Amino acid sequence: MDLNGKVAIVTGVSKGIGLATAQVLLARGAVVAGWGRSKPEGLQHDRFQFFECDVRHEIAVQEAFTNTQRELGQEIHVLVNNAGLGIAGPVDGFSTEDWHTMFDTNVHGLFYCTKAVLPQMKRQQLGHIVNIASIAGTTGIENMAGYCATKFAVRGFSQSIFKEVRNDGIKVTCLYPGSTQTNFFDGIPGTDAHSQMMQPEDIAGAIVYALETPFNFHIVDMEMRPLQPKKQG
């Protein structure tokens, strides 16, 4: 897809991978609707518009979608389901509220956003949905059972829906990033983000690579990891 002039929705746009993705999309000529609970600091661009949205609530997603079409036009070409969070802890001491918060954001929010854009993408017979899963969607991790469960769900959802919509000219790509230097690790005891991790810009670059593939070329899954993940010295 030639991204020049195309409309892209990016969830979780305020920081990390979402913010980096919005910036790279803008550099490629896209019009970006940034959805998030807070506006990204320092992102000023005539092709960027922020829409306040908490993806945990379907009515908020529906309102953000309506507002996006009203402001940017009916056609929606790209959805990057990036909004997500991780909370660590052993299952037998885990907060039920935290469990629900992760599923409401990482799984239910992704479903609400995907459901919102699909009718328009089907009318266009053109679209690309990118779901940000995690290495945690491919293997279990001690004290991260809840987060892994959400990302396994994203993986299953992505691999199923791509088969549903491929004949409508809609691509679905699922990314499985390893450790990336973002605020994600702020809430993970014993793990600190460091420069040996991948950078948000690296993941954003991979997203744009998948988006810019020729029409009949479809990248379904992308796993990515840092080459030298341990902090040196």
Language-model segments: which ranges?
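Conserved glycine-rich cofactor-binding loop
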Residues: 7, 14-15
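Conserved glycine-rich Rossmann-like NAD(P)H-binding loop of the short-chain dehydrogenase/reductase
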Residues: 28-43
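The beta1-alpha1 cofactor-binding region of Rossmann-like NAD(H)/NADP(H)-dependent oxidoreductases
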Residues: 53-63, 96
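Substrate-binding pocket helix/loop in short-chain dehydrogenase/reductase
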Residues: 90-91, 98-100
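Active-site helix of classical SDR
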Residues: 114, 150
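Residue(s) in the substrate-gating loop at a strand-loop-helix junction
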Residues: 134
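C-terminal helical subdomain
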Residues: 168-170, 174-175, 190-230
